[in-house]
UniProtKB/Swiss-Prot annotation:
This is Nucleotide-binding protein LCA_0526. GTP binds at D62, L63, R64, S65. It comes from the Bacteria. ATP binds at G12, M13, S14, G15, A16, G17, K18, T19. Transmembrane segments: none annotated. It comes from Latilactobacillus sakei subsp. sakei (strain 23K) (Lactobacillus sakei subsp. sakei).
Amino acid sequence: MTDTLNLVVITGMSGAGKTVAMQSFEDLGYFCVDNMPPSLLPKFWELVKESGKVTKIALVIDLRSRAFYDGIIEMLSGLDNTQFVTTKILFLDASDEELVSRYKETRRSHPLARNGRLMDGIHKERELLTEIRNQSQMVVNTSMLSPRELREQIFRVFKTSDNPSFHIEVMSFGFKYGLPIDADIVMDVRFLPNPYYVAEFKALNGLDKPVRDYVMEQPATEKFYQQLTALLKSIMPGYLKEGKTSVTIAIGCTGGQHRSVALAQRLADDLAVDYPVDVTHRDMKKRKESVNRS
């Protein structure tokens, strides 16, 4: 393996947000492992090197693995001295008062307070984590952060140009086959003139140039399309700000053959200027399959 492995170790106080952090790194394209005993790290690296396919890893290591926690600093330092691994430690913290509030809200027990008071467990954990906190490259106090705000902070620091952290799926479909259940935005274009009733277009679909030109040259189509693209371009930054990693835009006509296909394809091409876009024509082949079965 010639690529450098980017390793982020997520650790910190219990209840400070490690689960949210791990989910954020997953959305940034990291291979994530939760609660790995540090003693297994050397074997894990051997497997990673042999695979040659993983370049970004996030590990959650905390006092749930208390029996294995000793020596973690030395193990990470050993990895950091190689050309193969670049290591960063992200330590999540919160005030005692906020941690108590979160534990009371979730009604969970602290891993170090099973036979005692909650505050005793928190104080003991702080003591045990002092060394790794001091060694951390990044300490985030989450006391005043919502899960979304913590996610945004992680994205700002760790997002790189190759992160596939947001993409758009444009889908055409036919209402006669049902709404796509995974769509975030659904547009109904059945108000547009239907090429199905034009004899020379009936056997074609919206990817064929004659049909595409027919659909897009309609005055109602052009007006609708300009308004649609203006709307979508204005709201996409909001989806990004809220931390969404994907948006599915579904455009439907009666059978999913002509109007929706032509519009979905054009929309995908235009949005691809600014965002990663995939396009799917869900029902375009269904009429052909139906004819072949008859």
